[in-house]
From Swiss-Prot:
Residues 13-189 form the PITH domain. InterPro entries: Galactose-bd-like_sf (IPR008979), PITH1-like (IPR045099), PITH_dom (IPR010400), PITH_dom_sf (IPR037047). This is PITH domain-containing protein P35G2.02. It is found in: Cytoplasm; Nucleus. One of its GO terms (cellular component) is nucleus. Keywords: Cytoplasm, Nucleus. SUPFAM superfamilies: Galactose-binding domain-like. Belongs to the PITHD1 family.
Length: 207
């Protein structure tokens, strides 16, 4: 297995003119991203964009039955995560927090409430403009990543939809030598089958 490298230099077909030089954008298996509770099928994978399209609102994702969105993001190798960037809107569609669950292939809305998040991050209650927030993670907790679950929700249990315009991941990456293991997810879940997660179980932060 070759040594770690930064995907913008070695993987990306369209290198950045500006922005993070340690993006994991091209190291994500974007065609295999699954988003649970998305209003428009396959819209969730489109918010994982190259840096130069981070303010392009042609593609956004909106939640369907309630405020929750769960992204299941597979990598084309072993990734180490340094930070996550999220762009949201300054209105009622903004999520209040998100939680990270590395290397889990068994999570959906039935099971995630029973699992301790590795880290949980909160967005500011008020902000102006469509802002990109960057959240550094505890890198030691996100090494040898083959997949990452990102769970967005609101603290008030609102039924207003959540919208996200951009998600970016920063870190380093070692590609697989052989073919990656393919995991089959429930691509089109029925929201009625997935009760809302107890907010008290999700809102824990670790610093």
């Amino acid at each position: 297995m070759s040594g770690p490298h930064h995907c913008s230099a070695d993987c990306d077909e369209h290198p950045f003119e500006s922005g993070p030089n340690d993006t994991l954008y091209s190291c994500i298996r974007k065609e295999s991203i699954v988003t649970l509770n998305e209003a428009v099928p396959d819209s969730g994978k489109l918010v994982f964009k190259p840096w130069d399209l981070r303010y392009d609102d042609t593609d956004i994702v909106e939640s369907d039955a309630d405020d929750q969105l769960l992204f299941q993001v597979p990598f084309a190798g072993a990734a180490t995560l340094k930070s996550i960037l999220v762009r949201i809107f300054p209105n009622e569609t903004a999520p209040h927090s998100f939680s990270l669950f590395p290397n889990r292939t068994d999570l959906d809305f039935d099971t995630i409430g029973d699992v301790q998040a590795t880290e949980t991050f909160e967005f500011p209650l008020t902000f102006e403009g469509s802002h990109i927030f960057e959240f550094p993670v505890k890198t030691r907790l996100y090494q040898n990543l083959q997949n990452l679950n990102i769970f967005f929700t609101k603290s008030d249990g609102s039924d207003d939809p959540t919208q996200i315009a951009y998600i970016g991941l920063r870190g380093s990456f070692v590609p697989f030598k052989g073919d990656p293991v393919v995991t089959i997810y429930e691509a089109t879940p029925r929201p009625s089958d997935h009760p809302k997660v107890n907010q008290e179980e999700v809102f824990r932060s670790y610093y």
